[in-house]
């Protein structure tokens, strides 16, 4: 066997060398083919490349074996020379693959290959390994590129899908909007007649309401004219006034236009105002005719013009004030542009107080701002409630007056002449039965309290029992006079005073004391006292400069108010002992109370004069102003403003009246202000000058000026 192998190796040594070269060339070619194939087709996998290399190596080994066999047959002698260069078949089979270290040792031990052949094999092996690494890297790169391409494609597809979805949504929204618009257009096309009909119906309803209101206003105006006509005729029959024929015929001419009989007008008047049935003969009851909407007016024999009627706000739905304003617009041109709702250039509508330069501007303001609307109606309803409360209080005050007169054992029929002529200024209404006692007609006198006019009469004018119960609402002072705590009167009507613009019937000193006593530590600063006034009474939320001056004056005037300096600053406290001493002096009639009375009249004489003048025999009729017979159904809103009780509060220079009313009971105590007659008029007889419709602004100013005199007396 050894000889055969040796001969084969010797004879085929050259062929082996050629085979090795061909093998290496084939391997190089295979590697080049692999590279070219890898370059051309990036999709060929490494597994296919390995198979391809193995197949090439097997083919090269087979060719090598075939060459060795053929060369061994041709030259067996040259095998000995070429033996060191012979490569066994097993090594040729291993060349394409990686040679392990064990195989290398076996090859070296057997000394089959020379060092050159080993180097060639190692180089070939390294080349193959490099090719494999390059192929693997290339494959990895290809895979990454493919993966990136796939990701990009997926992202693009997702974006396209999202865009498609958005487009679909937009299309759907557009379709929905188009459908809605089409539906609206269809509805508008289907229902144009309904909207027009609704508008026409609304316009018709508004026109009907306006027509009804106009008819109602005309009827009310005609009723008022009829009532005024009837009242003037009754006064003319009594011989109290003389009415020219032309003036009396004006209301009569307007009656046939209404198309209503007097009975129908009277029934409509009852339904509107809610008053009781008309009394045909109001003289029998010794009071006023309750059906008159305006105050009864009388004129003197020398003047032919009647005084303007006094209207009130107690008509339902707030229509009386507007109608009265329209009714009076013609008569105001003749009577010097006077109106109940207009005084001193200011509109007297509740809560208005707009400044009007002249009467024409006032009429425009009244027709524009206070027309028949919801606001005016609500204000009139509030005024109606105030009047109802005042009527209830009036009945109580009448009972109280009768009880007082019974207690004092004063008979009105006892004639007691007055020791000295006095000018008694009082706001007293008169009844019709008193007008019957004397046919004398009286001159018209101004109604302002600042310039009283004393008409010449044949004897002293007196207050009769028939006129006393008809006294209107006045400012009351009984909380101080009768030692009744103020808190017991304010508490039940706290909400009323807080919301209604009504003057509280208390002195400033009493209010200041109440504010301090209600505080937690019984002390208040001046600003805190102001805050209490505005918080408790709605009346003090206006005219701040007027009443704040009065508060400061009272604080500095009265000894019962003590100024204390503390951490808060200057605070005011109440000396209760001094306050009670002041009250006791006022009740017992201390001589200091009569310091304003002239020395010629003592306290007793002044008291007797006031009571005797008030309760003397009614020998002569009570002199009156034509505009002072108020409507009893309105609660006698025109008030008495002066004090009759000289023994309790002899001179009340601070007692002004407010145009509002108070919800408290006992508000109608009678006050008569006694004033000495001026020197040149001492020979003139005593008279009563009635006053009404005081201006709140003038009275507030008057109160500030007279405060030093009044507060010491209280």
From Swiss-Prot:
Keyword Amino-acid biosynthesis on entry: no
Residue stretches of biased makeup (Acidic residues): 698-714
Location (main, coarse): nucleus
Gene Ontology molecular function, alphabetical: DNA binding; DNA-binding transcription repressor activity, RNA polymerase II-specific; protein homodimerization activity; RNA polymerase II cis-regulatory region sequence-specific DNA binding; zinc ion binding
One GO cellular component, as annotated: nucleus
Pfam families: Forkhead, FOXP-CC
Annotated region described as Leucine-zipper, given as residue ranges: 387-408
Keyword Secreted tagged: no
Bias kind Polar residues: ranges: 1-28, 314-323
Localisation: Nucleus
Skewed-composition ranges (Basic and acidic residues): 325-336
Skewed-composition ranges (Low complexity): 291-304, 437-458
Residues covered by region (CTBP1-binding): 421-425
Function according to Swiss-Prot or TrEMBL: Transcriptional repressor that may play a role in the specification and differentiation of lung epithelium. May also play a role in developing neural, gastrointestinal and cardiovascular tissues. Can act with CTBP1 to synergistically repress transcription but CTPBP1 is not essential. Plays a role in synapse formation by regulating SRPX2 levels.
Domain statement: The leucine-zipper is required for dimerization and transcriptional repression.
Quaternary structure annotation from Swiss-Prot or TrEMBL: Forms homodimers and heterodimers with FOXP1 and FOXP4. Dimerization is required for DNA-binding. Interacts with CTBP1. Interacts with FOXP1. Interacts with TBR1. Interacts with ZMYM2.
Name under which the protein is recorded: Forkhead box protein P2
